[in-house]
UniProtKB/Swiss-Prot annotation:
Function in brief: Peptide chain release factor 1 directs the termination of translation in response to the peptide chain termination codons UAG and UAA.
Location of the protein in the cell: Cytoplasm
GO MF annotations, alphabetized: translation release factor activity, codon specific
PROSITE patterns: RF_PROK_I
Record flagged with keyword Iron-sulfur: no
Protein name listed in UniProt: Peptide chain release factor 1
Amino acid sequence: MLPDAKLDILLARHAALEAELLGQLNAEAYVRATRELAELTPVVDAVKAYRAGASELSDLDAMIDDPTTDAEMRAMAESERPVLQERQENLEQQIRIALLPKDAMDERNVVLEVRAGTGGDEASLFAGDLFRMYERFAALQGWKVEVISASEGTVGGYKEIVAQVQGRGAFAKLKFESGVHRVQRVPDTEASGRIHTSAATVAVLPEAEEIDIDIKDTDLRIETMRAQGAGGQHVNKTESAIRITHIPTGIVVMMQDSRSQHKNRASAMNILRSRILDAERQRAASERSADRRGQVGSGDRSERVRTYNFPQGRVTDHRINLTLYKLPQVIAGEALNELIDALTTEHQAALLATETSA
């Protein structure tokens, strides 16, 4: 049974927003109210349909139980009841999911970090493949991707690449991508046709805002230096590169992609805030670990999450034991949503189980 009090609050909030939008609002308040109304409308429609269905179901039961109902009408009611019951159960599940506690970071932009792991040059190439997969996936969502820093591999791909993904709900979609991604394929340089296994690590951080993290100047050690090229040689004469160390956590960010020290510092601080925020989220999650059994992945960067097997054309997500024989479509970003949707569904099921047992 759904909690009527919660549903009444939801309906009241929806009505209040509709009334608010009929009044005089400034631009910021109008955007906020419109966005919240758009989020609430689908679940409010489901609640109204659910309540109408409950009334209809009650009428059918009364008709079936009434001894004066003629045989034809009773037979019709009995045939309609299972269909209506199934629709009610689907609506109830939809509403329960909508009422689950929301991750406050789900609507945030993302700082995406992809790093080559074990496997040498092949790992760098795979890191490049992964980044392009996310880049194309983001484009399909209508999001914007901006590279913040990149260290290219010797034969292509990336040793490390950091980018900002800007778009509504970016973190909600991408947060389950964090972890170790493994690839199995025959490198172009492998004459014997032997399959090599390489890995890359993906970190998806919700972009922090200044109000999220209070960073004192005294907690920072800031060093400037001349930017260096791939071979270690200095590529400009000014000290535009910057390295910032957050002393309490030991988190270090170095930025040198821009010729402007000011831009490098701003980018480094943005990443630093996001990493500190992520570290705090990870710590809080580990403290709740006893309550998180069965949820999708731990978010641990060392957790192996997915294997891409090129010879067999398959992708396996180890957290939910899902295998898709759509590797070209996944790596092109086109079928990545199938994995993300399955992970989200599993996560929601785990949350529902926790809520039910609470």
